[in-house]
């Protein structure tokens, strides 16, 4: 419908009708970041993200990549790398306008495709 980007991010569970499917992707993304992506050397995560066309951005996270899946449909990966005190953590985020463009089912597919490509595995069955 041509809704502009708001600049405000939401999780998949905050998506319209996203509590069940979106929440599942949020939990899965957090697990994949903690177990697989957040333990990579930053240079390797950068290489993987750039190979998918992502742009790296300054952020409050240790690492932030924006994947422009479609016009007006960015997906951000934010990662806080593991250290001596805390395990890695992170999440996938969407612009608040995302529900204007894709259903929650399609949004979950987008998120799982990104995660699968970054890990080279199929952690999330669509």
Protein language model features and the residues they cover:
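Negatively charged, low-complexity tracts enriched in Asp/Glu with abundant Ser/Thr
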Residues: 15-62
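Amphipathic, interaction-prone secondary-structure segments
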Residues: 55-81
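Intrinsically disordered, low-complexity regulatory segments enriched in Ser/Thr/Pro
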Residues: 80-105
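Conserved aromatic-histidine-acidic binding/catalytic patches
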Residues: 21, 33, 65, 98-102, ...
